[in-house]
């Protein structure tokens, strides 16, 4: 089985990749940093015999989300995990960074879910996990 994990270069995404590799799943690791993805791949392959493909791509760009879907097929499990946050006084935070955050944290999830779900429905098989931050439910001060 093939699992595609976005935000796989660190944190929850990296940890999920390690756990799923231990269970024998083949992985497609996605993140902006090819260098970090390569380190994750090497670390996983030290102890696991699975196939790992890395894809370095910025999911804040809608076209890149579509490109990822066109490039990576036959996904059994999609883990939408890419994301980042920003905090500070609203009038002082950077608008471009906020728009990139919205595109990564919301738009990319929507696009990838829509595209991969269509594939999964066609083969009548598949799972999608959307990872979210508690900040979406209980934002902290100045977020």
Where are these regions (language model features)?
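Conserved glycine-rich Rossmann-like NAD(P)H-binding loop of the short-chain dehydrogenase/reductase
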Residues: 23-39
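A short, exposed helix-loop element centered on a Lys and neighboring polar residues
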Residues: 113-114
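Residue(s) in the substrate-gating loop at a strand-loop-helix junction
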Residues: 133
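Conserved NAD(P)H cofactor-binding loop of Rossmann-fold oxidoreductase domains
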Residues: 81-86
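Conserved glycine-rich cofactor-binding loop
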Residues: 9-11
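The beta1-alpha1 cofactor-binding region of Rossmann-like NAD(H)/NADP(H)-dependent oxidoreductases
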Residues: 34-35, 55-67, 95
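Substrate-binding pocket helix/loop in short-chain dehydrogenase/reductase
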Residues: 89-91, 97-102
């Amino acid at each position: 089985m093939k699992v595609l994990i976005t935000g796989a270069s660190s944190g929850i995404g990296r940890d999920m990749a390690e756990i799923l590799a231990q269970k024998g799943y083949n992985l497609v690791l996605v993140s902006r940093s090819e260098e970090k993805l390569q380190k994750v791949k090497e670390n996983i392959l030290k102890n696991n015999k699975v196939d790992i493909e890395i894809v370095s791509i910025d999911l804040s760009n809608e076209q890149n989300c579509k490109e990822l879907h066109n490039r990576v097929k036959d996904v059994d499990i999609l883990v939408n995990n890419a994301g980042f946050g920003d905090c500070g006084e609203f009038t002082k935070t950077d608008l471009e960074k906020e728009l990139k955050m919205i595109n990564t944290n919301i738009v990319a999830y929507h696009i990838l879910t829509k595209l991969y779900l269509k594939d999964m429905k066609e083969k009548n098989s598949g799972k999608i996990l959307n990872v979210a931050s508690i900040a979406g439910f209980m934002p902290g001060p100045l977020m």
